[in-house]
Amino acid sequence: MGCIFSAIVFCVKILDKSNKGTYNTNIITSNLGVIIMKVLSIGNSFSQDAQRYLHCLAKHNGMAMKTVNLYIPSCHLQTHYLNILDDNVAYDFEFNGESTGIKVSIRQALVSDDWDVITLQQVSGCSGKYETYTPFVEAIAEYVRKYRPHAKIMIHQTWAYADGSEALDKWVEYTTAEEMFAAISDAYAQAASAINADGMILSGEAMITAIRMGLQPAHRDGFHASLGAGRYLLALCWYKTLTGKDISSDSFDDFDELVTDEQRAIVIKAVNSVVKA
């Protein structure tokens, strides 16, 4: 994917004094003009899946969107909270769906730009158990509002593991993807209420809906999204939720893995059935 290189970063620097420095990427332009939406995810590999195509899909549809994912694999809300307490420079700074090789803390990322949307999520293995969210999600939301009081905080509802997968059979206590999703949906709803979230990105519901409609493969390893249709579904879900724009005729095709016409049709139908403009 080459569209990241259409963004020219005029100022990217770390001023690191005992890991307490600042990270600044807020002077950015693109061949579409100024950035008109800035999205930051405090997440893990599931937000990585969701953001892989988001910037490029938005660009394809004529919108300049800056996306940043703070990545630690399998990162729990409790780990995010502990990293906040120590201002740990522990996160891979993923910019517009690509790795950068830069490490940052949550604070450094928060102050690096005037974010429009900041997303929070739980690690997938605990996503159906609300007791694992609290009190960490509340503390993280409070910290986010301290540094970015005008940003919208949104919950990223993640998805269930695939039926028949080792992940579902051995890692969690559910017997079916539908059972896992029901627990996930309830837990994220409680989390959104607890932090007075500005909204929810319904990736989990879009994923299970697409699977019901016959999407295969939706996962690549039983739990992460497939590199083609799965990640495309997530990008469309985020794009429509964040912008309200119509996706019915979307023709984005810069994928890491082939997306067939049949898969595209299912993905668009599923997202449209879940996300109402």
Model segments located where?
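A structural signal for well-ordered alpha-helical scaffolds and beta->alpha junctions
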Residues: 47, 51, 137, 181-185, ...
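Alpha-helical cap/lid subdomain in secreted, periplasmic
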Residues: 104-228, 240, 249
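Short, intrinsically disordered, low-complexity terminal segments
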Residues: 4-9, 44
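Conserved SGNH/GDSL esterase-like catalytic core that processes O-acyl groups on lipids
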Residues: 38-40, 46-134
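Conserved catalytic region of serine esterases and O-acyltransferases that act on ester linkages
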Residues: 35, 218, 222-225, 229-231, ...
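Short, Lys/Arg-enriched N-terminal segments with co-localized hydrophobic residues
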Residues: 9-36
